[in-house]
């Protein structure tokens, strides 16, 4: 390969930096085992807060903190019915990332909590 030095020395355009910031925010919001379980649940069905808290094993207070981070990145949406708030996720980006994680770690999302992120070579 013949790389020209002047080409590699050019600074990245501002758009690249902006894209990297957006991607980092997205990945940061997902970078928690409980948030992965929350998103995995919400892409499959809309859920009320109480049911979601029970399903993922969190108090409603702890769940609220996680949902706040996911809402900040627009990874979940809400719907109110009287006094009940329902959450769901239909983000294509979330579906793609969860699909990639499933391909790497298997179909059982609970395995994401149990398996190391880097596999040891044999």
Swiss-Prot record:
SUPFAM superfamilies: Winged helix' DNA-binding domain. Binds to the operator site in homodimeric form. Coiled coil: none annotated. PANTHER family: ARSENICAL RESISTANCE OPERON REPRESSOR ARSR-RELATED. InterPro entries: ArsR-like_HTH, HTH_ArsR_DNA-bd_dom, Metal_resp_trans_reg, WH-like_DNA-bd_sf, WH_DNA-bd_sf. It comes from the Bacteria. Negative transacting factor controlling the nod regulon. May control the expression of nodD1, nodD2, nodD3 and nodABC genes. It holds the Pfam family HTH_5. It comes from Rhizobium meliloti (Ensifer meliloti). Keywords: DNA-binding, Nodulation, Repressor, Transcription, Transcription regulation. This is Nodulation protein NolR. The keyword Ribosomal protein does not apply. One of its GO terms (molecular function) is DNA-binding transcription factor activity. Transmembrane segments: none annotated. Residues 49-68 bind DNA. The keyword DNA-binding applies. R.meliloti strain 1021 has a frameshift mutation in the nolR gene that disrupt the protein coding region. Residues 15-109 form the HTH arsR-type domain.
């Amino acid at each position: 390969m013949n790389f020209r030095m002047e080409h590699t020395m050019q600074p990245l355009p501002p758009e690249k930096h902006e894209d990297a910031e957006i991607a980092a925010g997205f990945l940061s919001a997902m970078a928690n085992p409980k948030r992965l379980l929350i998103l995995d649940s919400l892409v499959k069905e809309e859920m009320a807060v109480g049911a979601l808290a029970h399903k993922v094993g969190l108090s409603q207070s702890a769940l609220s903190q996680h949902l706040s981070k996911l809402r900040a990145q627009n990874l979940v949406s809400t719907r109110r019915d009287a006094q009940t708030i329902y959450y769901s996720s239909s983000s294509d980006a979330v579906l793609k990332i969860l699909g990639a994680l499933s391909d790497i770690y298997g179909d059982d999302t609970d395995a994401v909590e149990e398996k190391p992120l880097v596999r040891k070579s044999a």
